[in-house]
Amino acid sequence: MFSFRNQQVLTFVSSLSTFVTIILNHLKKWWSDVTLRTRLMAMTTLMVSLLMSSLTFWTLTSIQQETRLIDNRFGKDLSLLLAVNITPILEGDNYLQLQQFIEHFYLSTSSIRYILVFNADGQIYYSIPFSSETAINFFSLSEYNCFRNENHYFSNTPIVNTNNRLQGEVIDIIIPLSKEKKLLGILNIGINSNPTLTTSSQLTRDVSVAVFISIWLMVILGAAFNAFTITRPIRELLTGVKNIASGDFYQRIDLPFGGELGALIFNFNEMAERLEKYEQQNVEKLTSEKAKLETLVSTIADGAILLDKDLRVILVNRTAIENFGWEGKNIAGSIIVDYLPEDINQQLFPILNDIIRKNFLEQSICETQEICIKLQKNYKKTFRVLLTTVLDHKYSILKGIAMTIQDRTQEVELNEIKNQFISNVSHELRTPLFNIRSFLETLYEYHDSLDDSQKLEFLAIANKETGRLTRLVNDVLDLSRLESDQEYTLQPTDLVSAVEQTIRTYQLSAKDKRIDLHIDIEQNLQCVLGNYNLILQILANLVVNSLKFTHPNGIIILRAYTVDDLKTETEVQHFNSQKVRVEICDNGIGISRKNQERIFARFLRIENYVHTLEGTGLGLSIVKNIIQKHNSEIHLYSELKNGSCFFFDLMIAKDE
């Protein structure tokens, strides 16, 4: 049973502790949500209310104490007066006279509550309005014995106490009755306290609490009045000003206030309306300017990127998107370094940081930096990047950086090919010139010691080298002529004659290399629209190219046949619905797929990759240019180590 009660007590204490904790947490949360201004106001109000309540309490308490002191003095005087009058009567032991005097004195003084007279032995001699037995029950004799034991009666000094044993507060005064240092008795008189003192303590508390509550009520009412009449419109105005400052010009205040506050609200709404119209005009103007800028940037051949001072992308054109493979990505507002290739970031990011640092730490000046970036990892590309700072010219503050990206990959490759071409041509020209000079000098210096067969052999070699030199020079001249704007007259041409002439020209060369050179021409092949000499040059270059890359015992076939024209242009004269296709095929070393895309570039030689054959690298470029002059394209099908097949189509000349 005892254990069960202890368990109940512990459960109750635990529940009470949980409840108190929850209340405290709610109070802490509520207090944390209160603003600092409200906290300060509450603390100030609390301090003022406590101060005013304390002052009120102190003032009323002082008045109460002063009143009590006056009552005590009155009681002392009254008791001394009574003691002086009853001492002779008590000395004469005249009980009846004592009774009459005390009764008369009691009845004539309304403030007296009771009168007790003790004899020298401490026994009640007379009492009013209580009987002796009742008085003994209400009052103890300790005070009287104190007088007797400590001889206080010699001083005739009254003892004043407050007696609460009766209903109401009574000032209890004890005075020794003595004459000539002889104790005759003791007078105990009870005087009713001032009625105001009875209620003054409660009044003091009530007034202090009322002052405290009144101050809080005044503050609360003042705050409520202030909130509804002043604070609310001011708060609305403050919110409106903040929204206006943040760019929300649609903010309006709709409060029914008159006077100066109403005029202020009206002027605020009018200002917001004007700002809204001004913003709309600016937005339209900015939109128009932005559209113009975007149109201008999009038409620039180079890549263009505009960054803000935090390196976030503001504007990027199509060329830059294609250069960096950003198709389908929305990079506007993103940091540029998150989207650039790693190679570019490593070279570009330090420079961008340096530009921003210098413009923040030093006086901002407009500057342009140029860097060349080469990509080597996934694909080889070369970019020329121009970085130009964009400044606010009024305050010389950095606003952003403009990046111009030029793809110089093709130029670099052409430059490399050109350098290779110069190296090849210089080598190819130097070799025949050296051979020609060597053999001519030998003939000149040793012609007497050489027989006719040796002289003829030297002259034949010199003649061969001269032809080789002539071909090199002609290749360069032909390419320059073909790349110019010179117009060539296209007329009906006998393609069969051109093919047969080419075969006759290179039949001996093919025989020397043990290569079979065949032709396969469709019977009754129609004439084509072209330039006979240029067609001869096409066939010669392609046949020479095949001879160069075909192993001994190989085969070269030159075909010509009619094919349907899938892109017939019936409105153009000299055209019909068919074309003649020319093919030059071999079973030589073939061309890799990678090189097939580059084989028609100027100065590029397939021997750059095999390092066994000679040439300038202009033959196929010349072929491509000639075929383009004939409004056609050259195509290539090749497999490495299996051979190659070049083919192109020529338009059939219309019969007049």
Curated annotation (Swiss-Prot):
It is an enzyme of class 2 (transferase). Residues 289-359 form the PAS domain. It catalyses: ATP + protein L-histidine = ADP + protein N-phospho-L-histidine. GO terms for cellular component: chloroplast membrane. Pfam families: HAMP, HATPase_c, HisKA, PAS. Residues 424-654 form the Histidine kinase domain. This is Uncharacterized sensor-like histidine kinase ycf26. It comes from Porphyra purpurea. The lineage of its organism: Eukaryota, Rhodophyta, Bangiophyceae, Bangiales, Bangiaceae. The gene is ycf26.
